[in-house]
Amino acid sequence: MQKKLDCLRLKTWFLAEKRDLPWRQTTDPYAIWISEVMLPQTQVAVVIPYFLNWMQRFPTIRHLAAASLDEVIKTWEGLGYYSRARYLHEGAKELVARFDGELPRHEELLKKIKGLGPYTIGAILSFAFHQKKAAVDGNVIRVLTRYFGLEEDIAKPATVNQLRHLAQSLLPDEEPWIINEALIELGATICQRKARCHAC
């Protein structure tokens, strides 16, 4: 029998211990999109002021689309990975042209937007629209492979796809987005690269 995830225990832990992060205080799809593009390979403490400044400078998709690329790059300056800023700018223009400046609620439509990959799409659908959709980033991959004792090579796309299916199967019908956030939080704070198993 496959090992099961104790969603209630995980949810209880998360609600008690979660970090107070600005993008967790909103269900605005645009704000969540920006945070999820900024966060990979970047420390949360570094991202917070950039996120707050970005949202003040470009409060909506339309504001971002109307800005010049130079202004967008200058606002992003210091975060690195400048292609992300360009993709955000191009994506915003596309959203204005095709979806009236709104992020759509449907996965197939989100896939059409340049720069949106499986994780970011899952995060938007889950955290903004509260859909039952897994959001599998590096933190979640680490948690699942350790918890379920998986030894497959996570560098292989087939393994990542398998983990996405596993994560999807673990989500409860009630408040599934909290389990997504909890798995990410667990990987970011306890189940880190250097495991803190004693704290889990």
Where are these regions (language model features)?
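Catalytic cores of DNA base-excision repair glycosylases
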Residues: 2-198
